Amino acid sequence: MAAWMAGRQKWLLHPAAKPLIFMVCLLPFAWLFYAAWSDQLGANPAEALVRATGDWTLRFVCIVLAVTPLRVITRTPALARFRRMLGLFAYFYVVLHLLSYSWFDMGFDVADIARDIAKRPFILVGFSAFVLLTPLAATSFNAAIKAMGAKRWQLLHKLVYLIAGLGLLHFFWMRAGKNNFNEVFVYAAIVALLLGWRVWNHWAKARRRVSNNAAVGVH
């Protein structure tokens, strides 16, 4: 078991690991590009592109949230080195989502987009998630961490929890029009599990600290 864990850690630290995972993260984009070029997006390709890019945004947000639990549970610290790249891919797909909506639904008409944001709550919520995700992407580099300080940087990046909630609400309202919530419940369960683990882990750490302090006090 120990040898297997060491081998996994060694592979994740290999110079080829990041480029390989980068290429894997690009696969959804490559497929969408090919499907659009070869006319395989169905009867409504514009809607398919808007929907698919939104789905992949939410999936990557879930993947980012899963990094810390997986790192702790599997005792694989090297997983943390991929979190920044995964977060940037979440931003990449949300930009594609926004561009698809702005182009295919709104024709890049800024006034129409502004009216739509003001008129439809689920568009407002989705746009708010994009706005909040932007500073996270902009400060995902070492220079930003150094400039902001680690504590302020960590506080800013806790916005990912709010972003996940807004993304779920956006998806829920979008699905409400079709009265189809199956996928919404799946994503909500995943996010709840990942956030619930964080609450439990924080509580467990606090309890261990209290126990350790009590043990020191006895001695």
UniProtKB/Swiss-Prot annotation:
InterPro entries: Fe3_Rdtase_TM_dom, MsrQ-like. Keywords: Cell inner membrane, Cell membrane, Electron transport, Flavoprotein, FMN, Heme, Iron, Membrane, Metal-binding, Transmembrane, Transmembrane helix, Transport. The keyword Membrane applies. Pfam families: Ferric_reduct. GO terms for biological process: protein repair. It is a multi-pass membrane protein. Binds 1 FMN per subunit. Binds 1 heme b (iron(II)-protoporphyrin IX) group per subunit. One of its GO terms (cellular component) is plasma membrane. Its cofactor is FMN; heme b. It is found in: Cell inner membrane. GO terms for molecular function: electron transfer activity; FMN binding; heme binding; metal ion binding; oxidoreductase activity, acting on diphenols and related substances as donors. The chain crosses the membrane at residues 17-37, 88-108, 121-141, 153-173, 184-204. The keyword Transport applies. Belongs to the MsrQ family. Heterodimer of a catalytic subunit (MsrP) and a heme-binding subunit (MsrQ). Part of the MsrPQ system that repairs oxidized periplasmic proteins containing methionine sulfoxide residues (Met-O), using respiratory chain electrons. Thus protects these proteins from oxidative-stress damage caused by reactive species of oxygen and chlorine generated by the host defense mechanisms. MsrPQ is essential for the maintenance of envelope integrity under bleach stress, rescuing a wide series of structurally unrelated periplasmic proteins from methionine oxidation. This is Protein-methionine-sulfoxide reductase heme-binding subunit MsrQ. The lineage of its organism: Bacteria, Pseudomonadati, Pseudomonadota, Betaproteobacteria, Burkholderiales.
